[in-house]
């Protein structure tokens, strides 16, 4: 089995921070420069809807002193109400982040608009974004199934709100925050379980610990935002796949540079370390409120099976669960997950997708409404095994890593979907081959 060794300087820039940097730049008064912006399809969708609403922006590939090429985005805006009515429905493609968070901005604009997406996105639930925006005074329409198209009758007279998140959701928290910036007065978002906090950090929002253990995010309304520069670190959700590769393949040692180590994003790494994975950190520092550092990964021949059953943990590793499940199955033939029904509403039903593919590889699985378990491997398939991507980039990447770790010949359908978030996925893997 081929070992994978070397340094990775070109992991994809963080998707979550890239989305937010572009949206905040469009809301700020002045010129916003974003270095190392993501070139993935989802983040390009965000730039596309901004341009369709009249925001002036440019993006260029620049070469740094170290020879690396990165994407530099510049946005020009005059503030919160710089947007103009689009000529057609706004195409978000496959990006749920674009659709949900941009809805919060459009709710505060004095025109009507409609958000649409590809076939996958048009099936995803959008009721969760309608309730807070309607309570603030915007008109929101959905399909009879509660999905897109999302019709928005915006207004400059949004009311402030105190909104309790019914479930952990950084996207809903962010859309309420973006809408609340346009309101006349202070708004609060109450969360019982923490979710990723990039929006709070990037907007420099105050938070308050409540007596019952919950947390309030405080958003002042009607105040101008000043443009500021942003630098986008490497995406920890993308790093997850290279970490799994290094842990699973004998003889491997991989160094991942400049990765976002925000505690609300790197919880999966602590899970892996707790299971016995050989993972270390170097060069930790804080830039723009975000903790960034290098991750060192070495092959770990003996790890404990992963069992994930705490809602507070699930909320902050939801994107990494497919890879964690495949990792644990490949390493130990065991895995167990509960309290993750949210996975069924992602780009695919990720619970069923992971279970189906693992079963094709001979693993014994039990599926629950909110998770699943892997209980050993009954057989090793002979010949080529064709696995489904389910048009889901994270499913495709998770099983592409399994292809390197298992003694089976695997083929993944429609693997081009990986370009949604990780265009150079296979290039990096090939560069690490020894």
Curated annotation (Swiss-Prot):
GO CC aspect terms: cytoplasm
Binding-site residues for 3-phosphoshikimate, renumbered to this chain: 15-16, 20, 169, 171, 195, 319, 346
Domain of life: Bacteria
Binding site for phosphoenolpyruvate: 15, 96, 124, 171, 350, 394
Keywords: Amino-acid biosynthesis, Aromatic amino acid biosynthesis, Cytoplasm, Transferase
Main localization of the protein described in the UniProt heading: cytoplasm
UniProt cross-references to Pfam families, sorted A to Z: EPSP_synthase
Active-site residues, as the UniProt record annotates them: 319 (proton acceptor)
Catalytic activity, EC: 2.5.1.19
Catalysed transformations (reactions): 3-phosphoshikimate + phosphoenolpyruvate = 5-O-(1-carboxyvinyl)-3-phosphoshikimate + phosphate
Pathway linked to the protein: Metabolic intermediate biosynthesis; chorismate biosynthesis; chorismate from D-erythrose 4-phosphate and phosphoenolpyruvate: step 6/7
Cystine connections: none
EC class name: transferase
Keyword Cytoplasm: yes
Recorded GO MF terms: 3-phosphoshikimate 1-carboxyvinyltransferase activity
UniProt subcellular location: Cytoplasm
PROSITE patterns given in the database record: EPSP_SYNTHASE_2
InterPro entries: Enolpyruvate_Tfrase_dom, Enolpyruvate_Tfrase_sf, EPSP_synthase, EPSP_synthase_CS, RNA3'P_cycl/enolpyr_Trfase_a/b
One GO-annotated biological process of the protein: aromatic amino acid family biosynthetic process
Function: Catalyzes the transfer of the enolpyruvyl moiety of phosphoenolpyruvate (PEP) to the 5-hydroxyl of shikimate-3-phosphate (S3P) to produce enolpyruvyl shikimate-3-phosphate and inorganic phosphate.
Subunit structure: Monomer.
PANTHER family: AROM/DEHYDROQUINATE SYNTHASE (PTHR21090), PENTAFUNCTIONAL AROM POLYPEPTIDE (PTHR21090:SF5)
Family: Belongs to the EPSP synthase family.
Protein name stated in the entry: 3-phosphoshikimate 1-carboxyvinyltransferase
UniProt organism field: Prosthecochloris aestuarii (strain DSM 271 / SK 413)
